[in-house]
């Protein structure tokens, strides 16, 4: 059951959230089926960025790295029964830059949109979840039930992290 009052986002929050998503898009978390081609350092930077941008979530969520890139946060609720999970992935497919009208990892704002890999699939979802949880934690919120945040860095290559998180 969802209840509560919806708040209108103020312009400062909108700018902050846009900036945070832009920072995520700029990190080249490109997955390759040949794992040796994947730049692991970009994935490490992405995870550090999450800790830096969302310190309350990082602390309350007892973040765990599962497998190479899987992230699992558990935010204890008033009850461990009937837990809720939000999921997203933060890896992207390779981008042939010559086929783009702009740098696919620029994260630039253009005509009110954030441009680049992950801005729609699905760093935007991950950013939205983290922003919402961070805001609620800032308000002193304790979820009614345990809340899990599950993020994979291998979705684009059908990696094992999501399965490992479930287990």
Name the predicted role of every residue range:
Residues 1-122, 126, 136-144:
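Acidic/His- and Gly-rich active-site-bordering loop/insert found
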Residues 120-167:
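Acidic/histidine-rich catalytic neighborhood of metal-dependent amide-processing enzymes
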């Amino acid at each position: 059951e969802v209840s509560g009052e919806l708040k209108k986002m103020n312009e400062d929050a909108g700018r902050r959230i846009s900036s945070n998503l832009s920072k995520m898009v700029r990190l080249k978390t490109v997955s390759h089926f040949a794992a040796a081609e994947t730049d692991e350092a970009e994935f490490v930077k992405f995870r550090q960025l999450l800790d830096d941008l969302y310190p309350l979530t990082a602390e309350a969520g007892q973040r765990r790295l599962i497998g190479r890139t899987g992230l699992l946060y558990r935010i204890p609720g008033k009850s461990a029964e009937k837990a809720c999970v939000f999921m997203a992935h933060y890896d992207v497919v390779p981008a042939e830059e010559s086929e783009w009208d702009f740098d696919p990892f620029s994260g630039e704002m253009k005509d009110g949109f954030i441009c680049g890999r992950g801005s729609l699939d699905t760093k935007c979802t991950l950013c939205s979840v983290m922003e919402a949880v961070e805001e609620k934690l800032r308000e002193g919120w304790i979820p009614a039930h345990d809340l899990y945040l599950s993020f994979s860095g291998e979705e684009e290559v059908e990696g094992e992290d999501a399965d490992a998180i479930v287990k």
